[in-house]
C-alpha cells in the first residue's frame, strides 16, 4: 500500500519533470540542427548556429543592454523599496495603508498596461524611446516587489537592535546603513536577484519603449519574426546555460553560507 | 551625540514619488486618452465614451475579453491542479536534504528566456514537431494531430510556466505548516485523505489563492504566449490591444482596452482580496 | 498630419513641459554618449535587416544605418506617431501608400537626376503613386506578388489556378492565411471579380462573407514568420497571400514549395524608399537610397534573408541561378496579370480592419 503510493508519487514527479523539461531539451537539441528548420528529423550535430549567434553583433549588444538595464533598474528598485519599507516599518505614517497600497498597486497591473501607459505618456511629452525609458518601466514593476519582500522581513527584533544603536548615538542614516541593511541583507539580495530576473526577461515594456538599441527578449522576438531558424534555439540555449551557471553559483556561495 | 530622528517621509517619499510619477500619472494620462477617438487619421479630443461603447457593441472586440477570461481561468485551474501534487511530493516524499535540489530542478526552465520558451513549445507541438514525430514513429498515430496554433497550445504554454511558479509557492506554503496539525488530526482519528481535505487544504488555501491570483494577472496580460502559440485563430485581450497600435496609431482605443483589462483584473483582485492582503502577517 | 492633436493648449503644454522636465531631470545620465559622425535611422520592412545588405554600405561610406522593422504601413505610421520630428531619415513603405504618406508631409522630394530611373522596370516606376505635382516622393525598390504559395507534392497544382479553391472545402484544414488585411482582401476581391482599385464600402459584405468562409477552412492566420514556418514545416500546404517572398528563400531547403498566380491574377506588392522631410541627415539618407537602387544594392536586397523578391532595377547583379528562382523571365506575364494593393481611404481602411478582426475572431 505504502509502496504503491510512493511509486505513484515518483511517477507523477517524473511526469511533471518531463513536462517542464521537454521544451528546454527540444530547444537545446535542435540548436545543433544541421539544416534550416529546427524540427525533426535531426540532421546535426552542427555548431554553425552558435557561430551565427556569436557573430551577430546586435545580439551581443542586446545581451549587454539587457544586463545593464537589469542591473541598474534592480539596484534602484531595491534601494527605493528598502527605504520605503524602513519608513513604513519603523514609523507610524498617517494614511499609511493607502500609501502602501499605492506602492504595491503596480503588482496587480499587467506589464502591457504599464508599458502602454508609459508609451502614451512619453509620446505626448515628447520623451524619446530609449533603454533608459525601459529602465524606468522596469523599476515600476520591480519596486513594489522589492518593497513587499523587504517589508515582510522587517521584524520587531530588528527594531530593538536599531533602537539600541540609536541610544548609543547612531544617526538615522548610520542605523540604516550599518545596522538595518546588514541585518536584512538576505531580503535585499533576494529582492535584487528577483528584480534582475524579471527585468532581464521582460518583453512587452521593452518592446514598446525602445527603437534601435533594445534588449535581448525584443531582439529574439525580432529574430523569430524573420523566420524559423535554429539560431533562435542557439541563443535560447546560450541564455539558459548562462542562467543556470549564475543560479548554481548563487546557490553554492550565497545560500550555502547563509544556511550555516 | 544623539542623532536627530528623521520622520518617515525622507524614506518613503522617493518610492511614493516614483510610483506617482511613473505609474499613477501615466495611468491617468491613459484614462484621459481613452476618452478621445480616432476617426480616420484625425484625432478627436472631445471626451466621450465612444471607444468603450464600441468595445461592448462590437462582437469581435468583446469576444477578446471572453476568450481571455476563458483561457486564463483554464490556465489557472490546470496549473494549480498539476502543481499541487508536485509541491506535495516535493515537501513530503522527497528526503529533506534533497528537497532544495529537487525544487531548484523543478523551476530551472524558469530561467530560459520567456520569448524562447513559447517558441520552444511551438517546436514541440508543430505538425512536424517532436511529439507528432514520436507518436507517428511509434505507430500510435497515422496522421499528425494539430496542436500548435490552437487554444490548447496557448494553455499548455502558459501552464508550463505557471506550474513551476505554483509548485514553488505551494511548496513554501506546505513547509510552513507545522507537523503538529497532522499529528493532531491523526490523534483525533482522521485518515490521510480526511486530514488532507479538512486540515491541510484549508491551511494552504491562502497560498494557493495568492499563487492563482498571480497566475491570473500574469497570464491575462501576456501577449507573447498567445501570439506565438495561438496562431491568431482567436484574439486574446493583449493581442487586441497590440493590434490597435500595430495596424494603425489608434492610441485612444488601445488605452480604452487597457483600462477595461485593468478593471477586469481589479474585479478578480477584489474577489480574492481576503487572501491577498499584503499587510504584515 | 491632418489631425490637430499636435496643437496642445498652452496650459496643458506647460504642465506637460513641467512633468517632462521632471522626468528628464530625474536621471541626467541618460544624456548618453555623442553619436558617431554619420548615423541614419531607417524605418523598413524586415528584408532590409540583413547584414549582407547593410554592411557593404557602411564599409564603403562609413555611415551607420539603424533599422527599425515594421510590418504594414499602419504600424509604420504608428511608430512615426510615437517619435519626434527628425527621429527618422529613411522610410521604406508600400508603393501604394506613398500618396498617403506624402500627403501627410512626411516625405521630401527626391532629385530625379541622381536616381537610375532609366534602369527601372517601367511598370514599377509607379508615377501615379510616387509623383505628385511633378515631384517624386519615393522610388520603388522591390516587388512581388501576394498570391498562392503551395506544396506541389501535397496539392494538385491544377487546383491552384482558381482563387475559389481557397475558400472551398477540398483543402480544408491545410490552408494558412497571411495576416495582412490589404493583400488578402485584395485577393478575395479579385476572386469575386472585383477590381482592387475600385473597392468601396459596398463591396465589403461580400468580401467579409468570403473571408469568413476562408477562415472556416483554414488552419491558421499568421504574420510573415508564422506563415512561412507553417508552410515550411508542413503545418499547412497552401498559403493565402504567399508568393515568391515566401517560397524563393525556402527553395533550397524545400524544393516542393512553389507559387502561382491563379487565373484571376495576383496582387502586386511593391516597396518604395523615400527620405523624411524632417530628416537632419538628408545627404547620408540619399546615399543610402542610391545604394539600395544601385545594381549591387538591388541584388543584395532581392536576396536578403527575411524574404526574396524581384528587384526593380533591370541591371541588378543577380546570378542566373538567383534569377531563375525569382522567375526573372516570367515577370512580363505576371505583371500583366496582377493588380495593385487596395488603397482605401482612412474610413474604408478602418472598416476593412474591422472586417479583418472579425475574421480573426471567428
Task: List each language-model region with its residue ranges.
Chain C
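A bilobed periplasmic-binding-protein/Venus flytrap-type ligand-binding module shared by bacterial periplasmic
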Residues: 147-154, 189-193, 269-282, 300
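Early extracytoplasmic/lumenal segment of secretory-pathway proteins
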Residues: 37-100
Amino acid at each position: 500500500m505504502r509502496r504503491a503510493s510512493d511509486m505513484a508519487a515518483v511517477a507523477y514527479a517524473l511526469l511533471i519533470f518531463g513536462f517542464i523539461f521537454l521544451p528546454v531539451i527540444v530547444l537545446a537539441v535542435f540548436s545543433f540542427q544541421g539544416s534550416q528548420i529546427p524540427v525533426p528529423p535531426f540532421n546535426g550535430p552542427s555548431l554553425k548556429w552558435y557561430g551565427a549567434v556569436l557573430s551577430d553583433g546586435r545580439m551581443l549588444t542586446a545581451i549587454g543592454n539587457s544586463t545593464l538595464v537589469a542591473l541598474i533598474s534592480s539596484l534602484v528598485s531595491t534601494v527605493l523599496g528598502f527605504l520605503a519599507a524602513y519608513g513604513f516599518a519603523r514609523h507610524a505614517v498617517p494614511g499609511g495603508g493607502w500609501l502602501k497600497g499605492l506602492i504595491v498597486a503596480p503588482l496587480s497591473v499587467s506589464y502591457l498596461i504599464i508599458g502602454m501607459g508609459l508609451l502614451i505618456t512619453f509620446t505626448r511629452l515628447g520623451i524619446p524611446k530609449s533603454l533608459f525609458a525601459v529602465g524606468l518601466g522596469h523599476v515600476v514593476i520591480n519596486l513594489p516587489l522589492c518593497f513587499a519582500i523587504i517589508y515582510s522581513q522587517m521584524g520587531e527584533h530588528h527594531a530593538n537592535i536599531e533602537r539600541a544603536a540609536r541610544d548609543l548615538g547612531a544617526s538615522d542614516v548610520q542605523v540604516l546603513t550599518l545596522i538595518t541593511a546588514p541585518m536584512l541583507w538576505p531580503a535585499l539580495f533576494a529582492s535584487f536577484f528577483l528584480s534582475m530576473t524579471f527585468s532581464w526577461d521582460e518583453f512587452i515594456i521593452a518592446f514598446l519603449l525602445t527603437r534601435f538599441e533594445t534588449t535581448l527578449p525584443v531582439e529574439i522576438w525580432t529574430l523569430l519574426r524573420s523566420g524559423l531558424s535554429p539560431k533562435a534555439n542557439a541563443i535560447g540555449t546560450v541564455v539558459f546555460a548562462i542562467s543556470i551557471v549564475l543560479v548554481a553559483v548563487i546557490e553554492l556561495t550565497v545560500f550555502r553560507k547563509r544556511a550555516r | 551625540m544623539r542623532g536627530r530622528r528623521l520622520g518617515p517621509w525622507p524614506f518613503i517619499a522617493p518610492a511614493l514619488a516614483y510610483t506617482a510619477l511613473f505609474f499613477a500619472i501615466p495611468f491617468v494620462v491613459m484614462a484621459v486618452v481613452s476618452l478621445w477617438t480616432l476617426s480616420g487619421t484625425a484625432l478627436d479630443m472631445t471626451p466621450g465614451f465612444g471607444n468603450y461603447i464600441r468595445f461592448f457593441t462590437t462582437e469581435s472586440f468583446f469576444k477578446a475579453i471572453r476568450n481571455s477570461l476563458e483561457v486564463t481561468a483554464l490556465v489557472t485551474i490546470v496549473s494549480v491542479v498539476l502543481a499541487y501534487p508536485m509541491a506535495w511530493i516535493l515537501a513530503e516524499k522527497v528526503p529533506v536534504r534533497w528537497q532544495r535540489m529537487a525544487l531548484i530542478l523543478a523551476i530551472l526552465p524558469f530561467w530560459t528566456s520567456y520569448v524562447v520558451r513559447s517558441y520552444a513549445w511551438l517546436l514541440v507541438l508543430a505538425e512536424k514537431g517532436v511529439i507528432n514525430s514520436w507518436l507517428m514513429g511509434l505507430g500510435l498515430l497515422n496522421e499528425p494531430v494539430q496542436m500548435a496554433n490552437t487554444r490548447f497550445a496557448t494553455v499548455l504554454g502558459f501552464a508550463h510556466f505557471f506550474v513551476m511558479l505554483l509548485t514553488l509557492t505551494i511548496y513554501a506554503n506546505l513547509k510552513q505548516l507545522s507537523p503538529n496539525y497532522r499529528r493532531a488530526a491523526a490523534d483525533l482519528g482522521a485518515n490521510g485523505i480526511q486530514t488532507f481535505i479538512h486540515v491541510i487544504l484549508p491551511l494552504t488555501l491562502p497560498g494557493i489563492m495568492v499563487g492563482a491570483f498571480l497566475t491570473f494577472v500574469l497570464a491575462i496580460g501576456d501577449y507573447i504566449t498567445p501570439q506565438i502559440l495561438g496562431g491568431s485563430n482567436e484574439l486574446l485581450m493583449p493581442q487586441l490591444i497590440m493590434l490597435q497600435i500595430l495596424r494603425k496609431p489608434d492610441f485612444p482605443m488601445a488605452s480604452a482596452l487597457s483600462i477595461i483589462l485593468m478593471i477586469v483584473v481589479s474585479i478578480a483582485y477584489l474577489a480574492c482580496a481576503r487572501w491577498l492582503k499584503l499587510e504584515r502577517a | 498630419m491632418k489631425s490637430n492633436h499636435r496643437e496642445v493648449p498652452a496650459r496643458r503644454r506647460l504642465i506637460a513641459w513641467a512633468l517632462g522636465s521632471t522626468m528628464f531631470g530625474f536621471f541626467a545620465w541618460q544624456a548618453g554618449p555623442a553619436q558617431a559622425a554619420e548615423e541614419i535611422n531607417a524605418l523598413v520592412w524586415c528584408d532590409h535587416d540583413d547584414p549582407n545588405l547593410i554592411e557593404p554600405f557602411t564599409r564603403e561610406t562609413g555611415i551607420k544605418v539603424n533599422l527599425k522593422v515594421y510590418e504594414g504601413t499602419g504600424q509604420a505610421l504608428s511608430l512615426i506617431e510615437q517619435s519626434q520630428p527628425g527621429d527618422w531619415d529613411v522610410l521604406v513603405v508600400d508603393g501604394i501608400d506613398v500618396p498617403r504618406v506624402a500627403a501627410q508631409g512626411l516625405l521630401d522630394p527626391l532629385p530625379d537626376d541622381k536616381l537610375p530611373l532609366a534602369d527601372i522596370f517601367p511598370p514599377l516606376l509607379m508615377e501615379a503613386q510616387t509623383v505628385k505635382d511633378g515631384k517624386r516622393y519615393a522610388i520603388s525598390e522591390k516587388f512581388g506578388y501576394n498570391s498562392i504559395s503551395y506544396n506541389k507534392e501535397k496539392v494538385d497544382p491544377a487546383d491552384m489556378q482558381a482563387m475559389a479553391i481557397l475558400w472551398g472545402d477540398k483543402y480544408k484544414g491545410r490552408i494558412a492565411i497571411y495576416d495582412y488585411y490589404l493583400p488578402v482582401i485584395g485577393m478575395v476581391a479579385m476572386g469575386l471579380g472585383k477590381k482592387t482599385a475600385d473597392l468601396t464600402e459596398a463591396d465589403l459584405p461580400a468580401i467579409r462573407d468570403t473571408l469568413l468562409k476562408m477562415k472556416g477552412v483554414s488552419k491558421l492566420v499568421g504574420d510573415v514568420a508564422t506563415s512561412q514556418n507553417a508552410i515550411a514545416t508542413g503545418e499547412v500546404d497552401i498559403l493565402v497571400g504567399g508568393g515568391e517572398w515566401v517560397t524563393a528563400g525556402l527553395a533550397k531547403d524545400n524544393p516542393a514549395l512553389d507559387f502561382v498566380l491563379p487565373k484571376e491574377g495576383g496582387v502586386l506588392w511593391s516597396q518604395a524608399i523615400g527620405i523624411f522631410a524632417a530628416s537632419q541627415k538628408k545627404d547620408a539618407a540619399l546615399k543610402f537610397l542610391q545604394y539600395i537602387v544601385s545594381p549591387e544594392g538591388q541584388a543584395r536586397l532581392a536576396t536578403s534573408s527575411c524574404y526574396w523578391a524581384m528587384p526593380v532595377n533591370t541591371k541588378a547583379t543577380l546570378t542566373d541561378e538567383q534569377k531563375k528562382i525569382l522567375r526573372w523571365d516570367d515577370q512580363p506575364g505576371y505583371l500583366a496579370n496582377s493588380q495593385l494593393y487596395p488603397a482605401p481611404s482612412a474610413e474604408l481602411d478602418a472598416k476593412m480592419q474591422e472586417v479583418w478582426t472579425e475574421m480573426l475572431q471567428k
